[in-house]
A protein has these predicted regions:
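Bacterial N-terminal signal peptides that target proteins for export
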Residues: 1-6
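C-terminal motif of bacterial Sec signal peptides marking the signal peptidase cleavage site
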Residues: 12-15
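Bacterial signal peptide processing site
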Residues: 17-20
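Post-signal peptide N-terminal segment of mature Sec-exported envelope proteins
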Residues: 23-47
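A short beta-strand-turn-helix
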Residues: 38-58, 82
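Short active-site neighborhood of thiol/selenol oxidoreductases, capturing the structured segment around
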Residues: 50-74, 78
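Structural microenvironment flanking redox-active thiols in thiol-disulfide oxidoreductases
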Residues: 73-133
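Thiol/disulfide oxidoreductase modules built on the thioredoxin-like
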Residues: 129-185
Length: 193
C-alpha cells in the first residue's frame, strides 16, 4: 500500500511540473537582460531596435567588414542556417553589428552583409553608441595592431546571441558551432519554446 502511494505521489508531482525545459546545443542564457538598449541604424539608413523584429527569432553578431576570418565564417554559417530552415527562415532575422564604425560605413555594410544573404542586416552607430550596445551585451572589442592608421585589426568576441520571438535573450552560440545545430536550436525557439 505504501509503495502504491509513493508511486502515485511521484506521478502526481511529475504531472504538475509541466513540460521539460528545452535542451539546446548552444549555451542557454534565458533570463539574461542583453540587448535592451540596442538602438542603431541599419545598412539601409533605418533606425532599428530589437523591438522592430518582434515575432521573429533574432541573431546578433558583433564583427567588422575587414575581419579576416571569424566574421565571414560566422555569416557564412548563418547563411547555411537560413538555407536549412527553408521557409521558416522568413521568421528569423540575422543582425551584424559593426564594432568598427570608423571604417564600416553604411554603404560598405550595404555591400558586405547582404552578400551572405539578402535578408541579413548590418547595423552601425557612432563610436559611443557602439560602445554602449557592446556594454549592454557584455561583449568585448578592441583595436589592435597599428592603431595609428587605417590598417588596424579589431579583437572581438566571436559568439552570436539569439533572441526568441518575444525579444528575450535565449542562447549564446559559440564560434564554430555547426549550421545544423544552430538551425535545430532556432527551430526549437520558432516552436515557441
Amino acid at each position: 500500500m505504501f509503495r502504491t502511494l509513493v508511486v502515485a505521489a511521484a506521478l502526481a508531482l511529475a504531472a504538475c511540473s509541466g513540460p521539460p525545459a528545452p535542451t539546446f546545443h548552444a549555451t542557454d542564457i534565458t533570463g539574461a537582460e542583453y540587448g535592451r538598449t540596442l538602438a542603431l541604424t541599419d545598412h539601409n539608413g533605418k533606425p532599428r531596435t530589437l523591438d522592430d523584429f518582434r515575432g521573429k527569432v533574432v541573431t546578433v553578431f558583433f564583427g567588422y567588414t575587414q575581419c579576416p576570418d571569424v566574421c565571414p565564417t560566422t555569416l557564412t554559417t548563418m547563411s547555411e542556417v537560413m538555407r536549412r530552415l527553408g521557409p521558416e527562415a522568413d521568421r528569423v532575422q540575422v543582425l551584424f553589428v559593426t564594432v568598427d564604425p570608423e571604417r564600416d560605413t553604411q554603404a560598405l555594410l550595404a555591400n558586405y552583409v547582404p552578400a551572405f544573404d539578402p535578408r541579413f542586416l548590418g547595423l552601425r552607430g557612432s563610436l559611443d553608441e557602439t560602445a554602449a550596445v557592446a556594454k549592454d551585451f557584455r561583449t568585448f572589442y578592441q583595436k589592435s595592431g597599428d592603431t595609428s592608421g587605417p590598417n588596424y585589426t579589431i579583437d572581438h568576441a566571436a559568439g552570436t546571441y539569439v533572441f526568441d520571438s518575444q525579444g528575450r535573450a535565449r542562447l549564446y552560440v559559440k564560434h564554430g558551432e555547426t549550421a545544423e545545430n544552430i538551425a535545430a536550436d532556432i527551430r526549437v525557439l520558432l516552436a515557441g519554446n
